[in-house]
């Protein structure tokens, strides 16, 4: 897959365990990234830590049933390469075809039904996560039960926390920014309230 670094996988669905997310992924030199991968990052990270790896199923055509894919794949021209057949029948890009080969081996099934099922559930094994230096957002931080309602540390009165200082699975993009701004505002109001409260005598 490294030869396809920087190329997107658009309009896909990823399934891990009982959770399925739709979105995009990007092939990187070190593996996979992107919104759909980030949405599953917490359970994937935990599974990799516990088991050493995690298998994610890629559905490259989530808007089509296996039956619809089978019907389209049944009309190939004799002598046509499998890559060309997939491109013409389903508009599969070279990076998507390569992902199929990565998942199912170089010799993909040639029967329309088996090939359709391979496209609907391409298993990719993940063996690690990127380090904190490359993180867009991170997990871990100050536990919520260590804080009062103003985001002040119960053990250190006058110390307030916000944003990614908190222990929560932060989403990426605008959601993370909004949550950071909101908790920052809540902490600032907590600071004001703390400073306005006379110290105990």
Task: Please state what every model-predicted region is.
Residues 4-5, 13-162, 171-173, 178, ...:
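Residue-level recognition of phosphate/Mg2+-coordinating polar/acidic sites
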Residues 165:
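Active-site metal-binding loops of divalent metal-dependent hydrolases
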Residues 183, 187:
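A glycine-rich phosphate/pyrophosphate-binding beta-strand-loop-alpha-helix module
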């Amino acid at each position: 897959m490294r030869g396809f670094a920087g190329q997107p996988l658009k309009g896909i669905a990823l399934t891990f365990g009982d959770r399925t997310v739709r979105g995009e992924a990007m092939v990187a030199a070190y593996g996979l990234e992107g919104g759909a991968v980030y949405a599953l990052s917490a359970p994937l990270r935990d599974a990799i830590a516990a088991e050493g790896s995690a298998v994610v199923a890629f559905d490259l055509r989530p808007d089509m049933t296996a039956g619809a894919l089978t019907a389209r794949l049944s009309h190939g021209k004799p002598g046509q390469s499998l890559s060309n057949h997939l491109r013409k029948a389903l508009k599969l890009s070279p990076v998507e075809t390569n992902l199929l080969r990565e998942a199912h081996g170089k010799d993909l099934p040639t029967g329309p039904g088996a090939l359709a099922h391979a496209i609907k559930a391409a298993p990719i094994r993940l063996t690690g996560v990127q380090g904190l230096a490359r993180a867009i957002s991170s997990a871990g931080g100050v536990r919520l039960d260590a804080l009062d309602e103003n985001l002040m540390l119960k053990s250190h009165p006058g110390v307030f926390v916000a944003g990614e200082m908190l222990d929560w699975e932060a989403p990426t993009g605008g959601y993370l920014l909004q949550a950071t701004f909101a908790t920052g505002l809540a902490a600032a109001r907590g600071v004001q309230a703390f400073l306005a409260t006379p110290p105990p005598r």
